[in-house]
């Protein structure tokens, strides 16, 4: 059973320790009031990461959970201490625990009396998981590419994606990226991906995860140059966000007629159970005919399910290696992964400045960037599939669900033994 411990670092790879410490410090140093972030571990190492002092509860069990925890009923709690109870989405509430009780203790007692899945931690979600913990963005830190480098895979020569709206939940769009890179022209920024002030000597630092959303949008646009893409900064705290906050934001987007929700998320959960707030959001999404959700499988190199990709209603994308014929060493895999697409050494738009590596074995290494980068991960195989779906929609008149099913059928028809269903950019020659 996973449990929180101050010794969670014991036996955990330095790579994973660096990633978690980065997130913990970022939450602690954020300007708004944020809960303390902790790691739970199991026999293999870190199991999941979550917010201490608050839990998510299914609404139909709320009064029973309050009774188990020795709390007053929902009405009294709302009347006396309303700040301790917040609606996340219909069917799920966020409960702030009494000061003396930990999340681990509270959930152990709730599960003992009501079983698993009634209440869960408020999990920390990050941009497309790695490191054996379902955390942190791509499979590698970004590598420099010259500014005049062309995208790889290349920009298709047609106008695919016209009339298709894609909501990209990521780290936002870098200021000026849509002007600096022709294939990003017209991409909308719901939120920007801000760079910090320059350091003395004119050095522009690039923080961890900055530029991730711009790179993903660039890959997507190479597949569907005419698609309407709205990039939002959902992961402003070191590439991470709490499940409760993210789902509240996503619920508001359901009213805007989005065709494809592209979520750059891959996270592990307590007992590998579904994220209950996301579960309710997906139910709401599927009430809208034709809309779909797509997410990366994550970069832990194992078959353990990551969320939200493991939900039946989500199209989940793994990564192919550089030969486009084998499974990338870092990609997650298994029956819950729907399709694989190229995800190693892609080249696309990025920030200009100095990036200092924060993950072993390159910790402290400074890398200079000029607006383009080479990057690997399921974060970047996923927008290839999203772009192919959008391009098919504009070509055939199908809605997103119909286009996705047709492409998944195509992927299954060309499945590679030992890998699985595969989709490749239709305009790009397979590497030798």
Model-derived features: where do they sit?
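Inhibitory N-terminal propeptides of secreted protease zymogens
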Residues: 2-128
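Protease zymogen maturation seam
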Residues: 83-165, 178-179, 365-367, 420-422, ...
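Glycine-centered tight turns that cap/initiate beta-strands
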Residues: 115, 290, 313-316
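Active-site core segment of subtilase-fold serine proteases
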Residues: 137-227, 248-256, 260-262, 353-358, ...
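Extracellular S/T/G-rich loop segment that most often corresponds to the catalytic His/Ser-adjacent loop
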Residues: 170, 306-394
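Short helix-loop-beta-strand segments that form the rim/entrance of peptidase-like active sites
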Residues: 220-241, 245, 398-411
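Substrate-binding/access-modulating region of protease and related hydrolase catalytic domains
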Residues: 235-311, 324, 368-383, 419-420
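C-terminal subdomain of the subtilisin-like protease fold in secreted/lumenal serine endopeptidases
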Residues: 254, 258-265, 276-277, 394-432
């Amino acid at each position: 059973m996973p449990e929180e411990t101050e010794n969670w670092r014991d036996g955990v790879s330095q790579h994973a320790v660096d990633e978690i410490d980065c997130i913990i410090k970022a939450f602690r140093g954020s300007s708004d009031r944020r809960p303390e972030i902790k790691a739970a571990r199991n026999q293999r190492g870190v199991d999941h990461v979550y917010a201490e002092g608050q839990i998510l509860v299914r609404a139909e069990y709320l009064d029973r959970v309050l009774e188990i925890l020795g709390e007053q009923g929902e009405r009294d709690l709302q009347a006396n201490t309303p700040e301790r109870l917040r609606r996340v989405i219909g069917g799920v509430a966020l409960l702030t625990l009494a000061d003396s009780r930990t999340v681990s203790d509270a959930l152990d007692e709730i599960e003992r009396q009501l079983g698993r899945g009634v209440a869960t931690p408020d999990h920390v979600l990050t941009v497309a998981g790695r490191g054996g913990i379902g955390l942190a963005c791509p499979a590698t830190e970004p590598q420099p590419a010259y500014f005049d480098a062309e995208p790889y895979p290349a920009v298709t020569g047609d106008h695919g994606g016209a009339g298709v709206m894609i909501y990209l939940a990521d780290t936002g769009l870098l200021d000026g990226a849509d002007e600096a890179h022709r294939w990003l022209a017209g991409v909308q920024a719901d939120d920007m991906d801000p760079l910090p002030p320059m350091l003395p000597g004119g050095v522009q630092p690039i923080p961890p995860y900055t530029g991730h959303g711009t790179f993903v949008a660039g890959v997507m646009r190479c597949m569907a140059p005419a698609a309407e893409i709205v990039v939002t900064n959902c992961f402003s705290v070191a590439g991470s966000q709490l499940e409760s906050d993210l789902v509240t934001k996503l619920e508001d987007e359901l009213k805007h007629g989005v065709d494809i929700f592209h979520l750059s998320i891959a996270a592990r959960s307590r007992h590998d159970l579904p994220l209950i707030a996301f579960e309710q959001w997906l139910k709401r999404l599927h009430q809208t005919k034709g809309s779909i959700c797509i997410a990366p499988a994550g970069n832990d190199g194992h078959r353990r399910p990551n969320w939200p990709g493991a939900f039946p209603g989500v199209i989940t994308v793994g990564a192919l290696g550089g030969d486009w014929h084998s499974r990338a060493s870092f990609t997650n895999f298994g029956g819950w992964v729907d399709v694989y697409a190229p995800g190693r050494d892609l080249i696309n738009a990025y920030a200009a400045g100095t990036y200092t590596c924060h993950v072993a074995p390159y910790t402290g290494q400074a890398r200079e960037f000029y607006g383009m980068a080479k990057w690997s991960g399921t974060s970047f195989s996923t927008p290839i599939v999203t772009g192919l779906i959008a391009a098919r929609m504009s070509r055939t008149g199908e809605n997103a669900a119909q286009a996705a099913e047709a492409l998944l059928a195509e992927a299954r028809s060309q499945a590679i033994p030992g890998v699985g269903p595969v989709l490749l950019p239709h305009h790009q020659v397979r590497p030798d």
